[in-house]
Every structure is written in structure tokens, then in C-alpha cells.
Amino acid sequence: LPDNVLEGGRPKVVEPDAPWVRVWKNQSWQIALFALVLVAVTVVYAFREKLTRLSTHKNKWPVNAFKYSFWAISMAWIGFGLMAQPSITQVLTWFHALLFQWTWSLFLSDPFIFLFWIFIIVTVFLFGRGLFCGWMCPFGSLQETIFKIAKALGLKRFQTQVPQKWHDRLKWLKYAVFFFLLTVSMFSMGLAEKLSEVEPFKTTFLVGVMNRSWPYGLFVAAILGVSIFIERPYCKYICPLGASLAMPSTFRWFGLKRKQDCNSCKACAVGCGAQAIDADGRIDHRECLHCLDCMILYTDTKGCPPLAKERKRREKDGLEITPIGVNGYFIPIHPATSHADQISAKAAKGPDPRMPTDPTLPAHKRGVGFVAWFFLELRDHIWPWSTEGWRSQRALQVAGLSLAVAATVAWGMAAVGSLSSSAIIAWWFGWSLYEVLIRLSGRRYVKDGPWWRDHYRVAGVMDMLSYVGFKNLLIGAALFLALKSMGVSL
């Protein structure tokens, strides 16, 4: 009926808020406080070099006061209070949403998890996974707190590390768990969620140990019991969430500092609870949990053996004790001189520990202008074949061309509705694995640090898996989106 014939006019219809909007409104002050905590830990970590310079190997409180405070907050308030422990199930859901259908209301339904993931994504690409895993993960903080308390109670003599050779093997287990869950999720998300009980987070924080059957409680108790004697065992060897964050950590913009002498000095490696420093003094940022102990030693004139040696020499000769420069060495007494004379002969001949692997620069990237650099960069991402690869592994390269053609045909079949989404994902996954092999035989390099710089280094297997996996995930998501925009039902 027209408005003029209705007594009192047409009634105003008030549309109710969406469920996620009501959640955000009802918890607004807690959300604001949670966001403030995330900003605070990021700012504190951004000033890590100032804090580590204020610390020594005997007094780490300028760093630990903040770190322990955030552990307490993450355990007591974020974990047990807000029940906002991030989980691998959210990573799997994100993969599915990216490939099939992105629904904002799904991710906005839990504001704390939503904000936590914004924090995680930003900081992983800035610093690596260590800020979340080492400072803000509720379960990780719980493990480390138990380890520290046990140490303070006199159990230090029983605490140990897994022998390095076994650690270097066992650390791959968490990646296997992650890839297994990811593969299962592509065929059955329900089954993947059940298998994700390999995470003790739900039992610990969401449901409670006393509210679940005994196998779940026993699993949590076993992990926390082992944590008394081994630092963060779950984080280092089992956690699929940590593995999923470790892979993009390969491309973090800012890493922890190393100096040339680190390749022959083992002081930092001995004290590294994450066992993330190798025999050459290089830090594996996929494994590093950012305790910052090595950064404290980096400028500690009494704790760092190379600095202590130089300090004693200067004191004996009555020379000035200058401050420590950004390169980790004493600033030269005479400005015109170099710090190179402070580097031991053994260290000078060894590998450069400032990068995770040996630096390199592809020949075709040398001395080119911006336009040429841009097209070469694009070609590097899309075209994995190389002259070096053809020379060393011609059969592998030819087979790769055949598989690439097959993958292209598979996408074409998907475009006309002749191939299911599961089949195209299987094809794309197979091609991605083969692309790793092709690149390792020729274009064996990845970037270290910001993507717009030409800081290349030799790629290890996990470096290449991380690079190809992340790149092809984005390409696959873009192709799925294009097919959907064309009206193709997948």
C-alpha cells in the first residue's frame, strides 16, 4: 500500500546487526585492549637492539622483563581467559577460503583470533615466526614457563637438549605433520579437523583437560612433563602451526645479526634453546624463537668471546674501549681504519654467517636497469627452467616441460568444467613439487630480506619448498578466482 493510506506512515524496519557485528560490539573494550597488547609487543620487539645493548649475559632483564610479561599475558589472559589460541585448523580454513570461497563473516566471528592473525601475518613477514611463537603463543609460553620454573627449582642438572644430529632430523617432523594435514584437508576438511587434535591447544585452553577423555589429557600432560627437561619440545618437533609459519619466515625482511667471527665461535649456539644456530654460526629463522640471547651476546664485551678478546687486548695495551658498532665489533679507535683486524684469521677464511646460506647473485641480474630488472624478476617467478639446469639435468628439465603442459591443460579442462577442484589441486600440487626439483637443478637461489632488493642466496630444499609453495598458492588462488568470475562451478 502507498505510504499516504497507512495510519501513522509505513513502520520503520530495523535490520538486526550481523552476528559478528554484535560480537565485536559486545566485547569492544576487550578487543581494544587485546589490540593494544599486540601493538605493544611489536613496538617492544622493534626496539630489540636497544634492549639487548642494555643487557649482558649475566643480566638479561632489560629483555626478559618484557618477554616474561608477554608470556604471562598470553597464557593467563589470551589463552585461558579469551581462549584465543591460534590453531592449524585456522590455517587450513584460510587455504580453503583462498582457493574456493572467501567469507569475511567466517573470519570476523572471533575478533581475537582475527586480530591475532593480522598480527601473525604482519610480523612473520617482518621478523619471522619467532615473535609469535617465542613471545605470544599461549601454549609455547606455557611450555617455556614450565622449563624456566623447573630450572629455578633446582632441576637444571636434569635438563638437556636433544643431540644436535637428532634435532636436525626430528625438526622435520612438524613439517611432515603440516603437509599431511594440508593434503587431507583438500579432500576432507572434517577429517583434517579431527586429525588436528595433534595440537594440544583445544584440550588445554578451549575445553579444558578435565572436560575431555583421558587420552587427550594424557597427551597434554606428556608434553608439559617433557617440557620440564627439554625446552619447548612440542614447538620444535611436532607443532604443525609452527611449521606453517616457519615456511614464510624464509622471506622475513629483518633477521637477527651475525658477525664474521660467529662462524668459528660457538658461544651463541651453545646457549640457543631452539637449537637454531648451525655449525657455521648461521641462524635458521624458520626454527628461531627469538629469545634474543644471541643478540645480547652480540654486543656484550664480556660474554662474546671475540669481543672479550679484543677488549682484553685493548685494556692490556692501554687503548680506548670504544662502543660496539652496528657490525658487532668495537668501533675502530682511528676512524680511517677498519674493524677487519678484529676478525680472527680462522673466521676470515670461513663462511659468512650473516646470511642463512652462501650469498649469490644470478649472472643475468647483474648491472641491469629497473625495466629489465622488473621483467627478469617476472620471468624468474614464472619460468623455472635455466641454462644451468639444461646442462646438468636435461632429462629432468624436459620432463618438467611435459608436466607443465599437462598442468596447463588441466587448468583448461577445469575452465570448461571437465575437471573437479580436487583433481586440479592434485595436478597443481604435483607440478609444484616438480618445479622445486627443476629449480634446485638450475635456478637454485632465493632472496633474503625485502623482495625489492637483490640480496640472493643459495637455496636449500626447504628454502625452495617455501618459495615455490607460497608462490604457487597465490597463483592457484588467482586462477581459481578467475574461473569463478567466469561462472565456472568447481
Task: Name these PLM-found stretches.
Residues V37-A40, M75-A76, T183, A395-A415, ...:
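Canonical alpha-helical transmembrane segments of integral membrane proteins
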Residues G154-L155, G242, P248, P356, ...:
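Cytosolic, membrane-interface loops and tails of multi-pass inner-membrane proteins
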